[in-house]
Regions:
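Catalytic or ion-coupling anion/metal-binding cores of large enzyme and transporter domains
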Residues: 1-45, 52-73, 78-79, 84-89, ...
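Well-ordered mid-protein domain cores that form the structural environment of catalytic cofactors
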Residues: 89-93, 97
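A short, small-residue-rich loop immediately preceding and capping a beta-strand
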Residues: 104-125, 136-140
Length: 572
């Protein structure tokens, strides 16, 4: 018997309450499907999800189920940038997961369709799926169109820094702002939103080929309706999310992450999702699997083209076809078939021919967007975990976005205790080539772990600094960030991590090939490892205990309980 029918016997009020919303008597006995989305007029990534949720509900009804629409509206990192709102970004992931858990368990459901588009909402719903463990199908809200001259939102940070330096006029800057987001959908670059949409499909929780579709494409509505039908089929079979998502699924997702040069935020989101499924996963797994992996995707910010072309080039299935010798093809998916079977079906049903038809209209070839395995952009993945006396527990760098001349560097420390001071120093030319800008007390326990997006844009948009300095932080970066940026430094400063002990003009060694990040000199003079440790010990005695400025609310709870970003940065 379906779980919803068992609960009906225990809660006689349930039937009349549902009929009060217009349900018919026959609806009460059908498989009950939770249609959970992050719809809201909060940003373009969620504003269109109501329509897709309704399509999913229709699909469930046509398959003999009954859908119920629930909402957990997310926030937009882009709207939170540049002020204290960004401190709520990572905590919002965990709060949304909590709300979905409440929705799913307070009223019993037999299955669910989960719809989201963006940075924190996709991992939030994936975390919730692992936690509630019901038959589940994910639908992502796709990607927005690019603007005139293929303008995309991640370029606005660059133009903002150029405007601040007087390099473009106010009229030019206004034009860029008014044309960067011409439609609904996730931002059209391979940032965290696009990456996490791809991760959802790579885990086996989406219908094949449906991640990162153009939001304006009718195919997306069809996919949402099919997801509703699939959720009913899974509910009738009793196939739970944990029957699909395994350690092998996460390893597949990490291999896809390497192939697309995905966002560094994935190194927090996938471990947090795995935690909810009861599967151990840490950042070192990314480092191991990225080594020697072929990087294939020519999409911004590291590549040339907007993300709307990803689907037209064949999407996740095309990436998987290219790297299939490095994937677990025997993993189960929501189709009830294995990954290998899904890939074979797509070849037979004309999926790739349809995609080629779309792409040919742009004058591009598939290999302009997704390179072949034998002709990759790079052959060592995209991500590395660095360690040393600055980051004993690790730090993350997206080396595919770092200029080659900065893969090994010796720099002078310029520490700042907040991002605002660092940005001011960069924009007023106080930072010089050979400096290492260090931003600390911005980790999960410090300020909620905001993104350092404007700092990276100020650096990467400056021709003199972009290949001559580095940014080190216990905070994190936007998926749009590029350049020599090392984040997630752990332990963080707020917990007494060594990053809190660095002083002006200490010498910082960065060695990405050998995975090293350490202080090798004091006050501009190189010295032994033992001498550095002796100085650190003396500085620690004078280090004042960190005192959080958050005395109530969400940020107090998050900064008191959040785990290390190396473990997923999730809140207990």
């Amino acid at each position: 018997m379906l779980k919803s029918q068992e609960v009906r016997k225990l809660a006689p009020e349930m039937d009349p309450l549902r009929m009060g919303m217009g349900w018919k008597e026959e609806d009460l006995t059908k498989p009950q499907i939770l249609i959970e989305s992050t719809y809201g007029q909060s940003h373009p990534g969620s504003a269109h999800l109501l329509n897709l949720a309704q399509k999913a509900s229709r699909g469930a009804y046509e398959a003999g189920g009954k859908g119920a629409l629930y909402f957990a509206t997310d926030i937009c990192d882009g709207m939170a940038q540049g002020h204290d709102g960004i401190n709520y970004s990572l905590p919002s992931r965990d709060i949304i997961a909590d709300l979905v858990e409440i929705h799913a368990n307070a009223t019993t459901f037999d299955g669910g369709v989960f719809l989201a588009s963006c940075d924190k909402s996709v991992p939030a719903l994936l975390m919730a799926i692992g936690r509630i463990n019901i038959p589940a199908v994910f639908v992502t809200g796709g990607v927005m169109d690019a603007g005139p001259d293929l303008l995309t939102l991640e370029q606005i940070g660059k133009y903002s820094a150029m405007y601040e330096r007087g390099e473009i006029t106010e009229e030019q800057f206004t034009y860029y702002k008014h044309h960067a987001c011409p439609s609904c959908g996730a931002c059209s670059f391979m940032g965290t939103a696009s990456t996490m949409q791809i991760m959802a499909e790579s885990l086996g929780l989406m219908l094949p080929g449906t991640a990162l579709m153009p939001a304006t494409c009718e195919d997306l509505s069809v996919a949402a309706e099919e997801a509703g039908k699939t959720a009913v089929a899974l509910a009738k079979k009793g196939m739970k999310a944990s029957d699909i998502v395994t350690l092998k699924s996460f390893e597949n997702a990490i291999m896809v992450h390497a192939a697309i040069s995905g966002s560094t935020n994935t190194l927090m989101h996938l471990p947090a999702i795995a935690h909810e499924f009861g599967i151990p996963l840490d950042a070192d797994t990314f480092d191991r699997m990225h080594r020697g992996a072929h990087y294939l995707l020519n999409i911004r910010p590291a590549g040339e083209w907007p993300a709307q072309y990803f689907y037209y080039a064949g999407g996740v299935p095309r990436i998987m076809e290219e790297i299939k010798d490095h994937l677990h093809l025997d993993v189960m998916t929501v189709t009830g078939k294995t990954l290998g079977e899904n890939l074979e079906d797509l070849k037979k049903n004309g999926f790739y021919e349809k995609c080629d038809t779309y792409l040919n209209k742009t004058g591009l070839k598939r290999t302009d967007i997704i390179r072949s395995f034998d002709d990759p952009i790079g052959t060592n993945g995209a991500i590395a975990i660095l360690r040393g006396n600055i980051a004993p527990d690790g730090a993350v760098v997206k080396h595919s976005a770092v200029p080659k001349e900065m893969h090994k560097a010796l720099l002078k420390a310029r520490p700042f205790n907040c991002e605002e001071d660092a940005i001011h120093a960069i924009l007023t030319h106080q930072i010089q080539p050979g400096d290492a800008v260090i931003i600390r007390y911005e980790g999960p326990r410090g300020s909620g772990m905001p993104e350092m997006f404007y700092t990276t844009e100020a650096i990467s948009s400056d021709p003199e600094l972009s290949a001559s300095i580095a940014l080190l932080t216990d905070g994190r970066f936007s998926g749009a960030s590029k350049g020599p940026a090392i984040g997630h430094i752990s332990p963080e400063a707020a917990q007494g991590g060594p990053i809190a002990l660095i002083e002006e003009n200490d010498l910082i060694e960065i060695d990405i090939p050998h995975r090293i990040l350490r202080v090798v000199g004091i006050n501009g003079e190189k010295c032994s490892e033992e001498e550095v440790q002796r100085v650190f010990n003396e500085r620690r005695k004078a280090l004042a205990p960190f005192k959080s400025r958050y005395t109530h609310g969400v940020l107090k709870r998050f900064t008191q309980t959040a785990h290390s970003p190396m473990q997923g940065g999730y809140m207990d």
